[in-house]
Amino acid sequence: MPRATLPAEARLHRPSEFAAALKGRRLARGAFFIVSASPCAPADDQPARARLGLVIAKRFAARAVTRNTLKRVIREAFRARRLALPAQDYVVRLHSKLTPASLTALKRSARAEVDAHFTRIAR
């Protein structure tokens, strides 16, 4: 059975890529997340495709379990909509402190917000 993963070429890796995307346009802002983007440079052998970077700061989500859960939820939302998004480098950044909640409630609210952001960007 094929695995539904986010391939390495769909992620930002270098600090310069993150910096360029964070300096780019802010596309969406919600209760927890800001989505910034900049045009990506296509490789010689590959067409330009949407790529994702995540910035989840420890000061906003103190527990490692919470940070990893947020990253997992955001990556899954991006993977589901990656082909519908314009070919840009996206950075999703947590911008406010999370209120204490169960992981189930956190997953639900984070997924709803990120889905709304990516749906708006895809239009």
UniProtKB/Swiss-Prot annotation:
<dbReference type="InterPro" id="IPR000100">
    <property type="entry name" value="RNase_P"/>
</dbReference>
<keyword id="KW-0255">Endonuclease</keyword>
<comment type="subunit">
    <text>Consists of a catalytic RNA component (M1 or rnpB) and a protein subunit.</text>
</comment>
<keyword id="KW-0540">Nuclease</keyword>
<dbReference type="GO" id="GO:0042781">
    <property type="term" value="F:3'-tRNA processing endoribonuclease activity"/>
</dbReference>
<dbReference type="GO" id="GO:0001682">
    <property type="term" value="P:tRNA 5'-leader removal"/>
</dbReference>
<comment type="function">
    <text>RNaseP catalyzes the removal of the 5'-leader sequence from pre-tRNA to produce the mature 5'-terminus. It can also cleave other RNA substrates such as 4.5S RNA. The protein component plays an auxiliary but essential role in vivo by binding to the 5'-leader sequence and broadening the substrate specificity of the ribozyme.</text>
</comment>
<dbReference type="Pfam" id="PF00825">
    <property type="entry name" value="Ribonuclease_P"/>
</dbReference>
<comment type="similarity">
    <text>Belongs to the RnpA family.</text>
</comment>
<keyword id="KW-0378">Hydrolase</keyword>
<dbReference type="GO" id="GO:0000049">
    <property type="term" value="F:tRNA binding"/>
</dbReference>
<dbReference type="InterPro" id="IPR014721">
    <property type="entry name" value="Ribsml_uS5_D2-typ_fold_subgr"/>
</dbReference>
<dbReference type="InterPro" id="IPR020539">
    <property type="entry name" value="RNase_P_CS"/>
</dbReference>
<keyword id="KW-0694">RNA-binding</keyword>
<protein>
    <recommendedName>
        <fullName>Ribonuclease P protein component</fullName>
        <ecNumber>3.1.26.5</ecNumber>
    </recommendedName>
</protein>
<dbReference type="GO" id="GO:0030677">
    <property type="term" value="C:ribonuclease P complex"/>
</dbReference>
<dbReference type="GO" id="GO:0004526">
    <property type="term" value="F:ribonuclease P activity"/>
</dbReference>
<dbReference type="InterPro" id="IPR020568">
    <property type="entry name" value="Ribosomal_Su5_D2-typ_SF"/>
</dbReference>
<keyword id="KW-0819">tRNA processing</keyword>
